[in-house]
Amino acid sequence: MIVAGGGMAGLVCAVRARELGLRPRVLEKGTRAGGSMLLSSCVIWRHLEFDEFRAECPGGDEALQRLIWERLDDALAWLVSLGAEPVWEDTENPRTTGKRFDPRSLTEVLVRAAGDVRLEERLRPELPLVLATGGFAVRYAHEHGLLVRCNPWSEGDGLEFALERGATTAGDLDEFYGRAMPAPPARIGEEDYVRLSQLWDGEARFVNEDGDEFFERLPAWHESDLAQAVARQPGGTAWFIVSADFREDPRVVALREAGGTVVEEDGELRLHVAAAVTHTQGGIKIGPAARVHGVDGLFAAGADVGGISTGGYSSGLAAALVLGRIAAETALR
């Protein structure tokens, strides 16, 4: 079995396939395994109540949402059984439950268990095939003049491969999960993606480059809605305005030290930010068995799949974990 992509979904799929007696081969076009999981805070979570999941992501596929919600706890226990040690035994969010892992340690555990992981290898046409190439965040960001907040290889290879073979899409191809990050000339490395995120939990006002306030409600708890709103402003940038009392706040200090722009005037700080794309939320349409609609012998998992979090946000790593396991189990049938 060929698995395209060596991030969370692809590695999980390969590990589960080996457990079931298959001989998977993971083809990762990048220079390292781990995908965007390696760059994340690595919290793998679900909503406490399924109704909250539906309310948070009302446009998503209800069957896929329920599948992820119902199977995540067992999938997390399976990760731990492989030797992955949680950093947190639960989330710190009263709306959610899950576990946090060290992303490097988790990647190492999965790579060891996956077996045949080949780097700098691209998609091949052999089937059965599992697509787990990480969506098209990089392509989307470049097309729209936004920052990239993910691994540099999520360019839509899986989506293109599937569409060429008759697949259809699900979800909104213009919807993404992302963050507001320090705007250029700030210097942002992969190791800064979590640390430099500008999350202000209702303590900021938001104006665009024309000085117009563009987001006059409280952001959602995850603030991805705010990042998407910033992306729609001229230049994909904005100014977050907070009290000058925050001048030594870690978020302000980090932005300033990264070379970002902080302007203090009239008792306020103006922080220059830009929208950054972590992963796309539209993508390949699949069913509950992770089969790609319209293409025999083709499966998909992770950010290549669309239509799970439409209209809101849910854990991309949770979807990758659950669907990666299911893809392996379905391929065995």
Protein language model regions, located:
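N-terminal Rossmann-like FAD-binding beta1-loop-alpha1 element of flavoenzymes
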Residues: 1-26, 328, 332
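A conserved short coil-to-beta-strand element within the FAD-binding core of flavoproteins
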Residues: 116-126
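Glycine-rich loop(s) and the adjacent beta-strand/alpha-helix scaffold that form part
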Residues: 131-185, 317, 323-326, 330
